[in-house]
Amino acid sequence: MTITPQQLIALLPLLIVGLTVVVVMLSIAWRRDHFINTTLTVIGLNLALLSLYFVGQQEAMDVTPLVHVDRYAMLYIGLVLVASLATATFAYSWLENYPDNKEEFYLLVLIATVGGILLACANHLASLFIGIELLTLPLFGLIGYAYRQKRSLEAAIKYMLLSAAASSFMLFGIALLYAESGDLSFAALGHRLSDSYIYQPLILSGLGMLVVGLGFKLSLVPFHLWTPDVYQGAPAPVSTFLATASKIAIFAVVIRLFVEAPMADSEALRTVLTVIAIASMLFGNLMALTQTNIKRLLGYSSIAHLGYLLVALVAVQNHQLSEETVGIYLAGYLFSSIGAFGVVSLMSSPYKGPDADSLYSYRGLFWHKPILSAVMTVMMLSLAGIPMTFGFIGKFYVIVLGVKAELWWLTGAVVVGSAIGLYYYLRVMVSLYLPAPKALNRDTPRNWASTAGGMVVLISALLVLALGIWPQPLIDVIQQAKIIL
């Protein structure tokens, strides 16, 4: 097989992040320096983002039988890189006074980013599986990075065991699909699964197992049990990555799979997805109502957000609006989550004990840090889907898609779930403006806004507001990022 310059350009983001992994590894071997390794990581991720401009100058192409680079892949590569950049930036201040080795953190983030980029380009079940494993394996180390704290270690072990079980389900499902169809590329599966062929028992079993594996990775009900514990136990910057990059990359490949291989034509699969979506929306929101830990609350709310996104998966036959809805919702969710977890990261440090994730830590924050409180308020409003924030645009798209596809039960569940969600997001907001307790158990650095993490949080808040008022520029970009069949 010959590699042409065009193919190399199409793979630029993947190659640049892969090269950054090697450079950071050599830098650690040569000399441990936290600042240098962070800088190398950030430069590598920024170069990968810039390289998307050159990728965009080319036609969509199959670089290899496993990888297809088009505008759709570019959009999600961009979102994954932004999430990874935010994670690396928050990690710098979080790790500043970390007593053990700091540099490996960035190495693990970069390897997981390579997995996310591969998933965004995957058009074959083999690259889907490799991408998911490349994304998941570094997370075992990242979740347990604060291993001196029992919660972090427990979360890592829990995630590792359950993730291994989910991966085995997924692999067995892929094997069953291969046994029946003889090919694993999405396009070939699309041809083979057409008409009555999709009702074969082996095909249905394979699809069922694939749904189990992917449902775990996306933390959908009933495969969600790890989510609150892992979000709570993981260091705050890792929770940012878990909530954003891993979900975005996996959902991107799932949408491509469902568009190219008409899986949603199976009535049984659509029914299963509808039940999972309604259960995720209601369970995620109801469980979040009673939480006093902000990371657990955001963990449960992420279950509900993925439930809302399943509306687009069930309505995938209307695929142009489906793809647009997913792009807009995930972009809004990305910026809102970066802001919310960023505030938690800024208030946390591994040498002070566990992260500042109790709601009590945020009580009266407004009276000490008014701008930080304003940022957190904007993020909660966006996650709740309140007008004038970008989160509202995403929620609006989901409801419009549900109505157009005549999915009345799902649309009703979105409305009910959003109403429940409003209550617990308001709880977080209200606690920020209550009278401050006399003994403040947490505080952020005085100059938080001039730190790199502070700037990322402020930019996220401004983007959420600006795109909430005038979302058209981003909508235009997302409309161009279509899957071309």
Curated annotation (Swiss-Prot):
Record membrane topology: Multi-pass membrane protein
Assigned GO CC terms: plasma membrane
Matching Pfam families: Proton_antipo_M (PF00361)
Membrane spanning stretches: 8-28, 35-55, 75-95, 104-124, 125-145, 159-179, 203-223, 235-255, 271-291, 297-317, 326-346, 383-403, 406-426, 455-475
EC number: 7.1.1.-
Keywords, alphabetical: Cell inner membrane, Cell membrane, Membrane, NAD, Quinone, Translocase, Transmembrane, Transmembrane helix, Transport, Ubiquinone
Subcellular compartments: Cell inner membrane
Similarity-based family: Belongs to the complex I subunit 2 family.
Protein function: NDH-1 shuttles electrons from NADH, via FMN and iron-sulfur (Fe-S) centers, to quinones in the respiratory chain. The immediate electron acceptor for the enzyme in this species is believed to be ubiquinone. Couples the redox reaction to proton translocation (for every two electrons transferred, four hydrogen ions are translocated across the cytoplasmic membrane), and thus conserves the redox energy in a proton gradient.
Name of the protein described by the UniProt record: NADH-quinone oxidoreductase subunit N
The species this protein was found in: Photorhabdus laumondii subsp. laumondii (strain DSM 15139 / CIP 105565 / TT01)
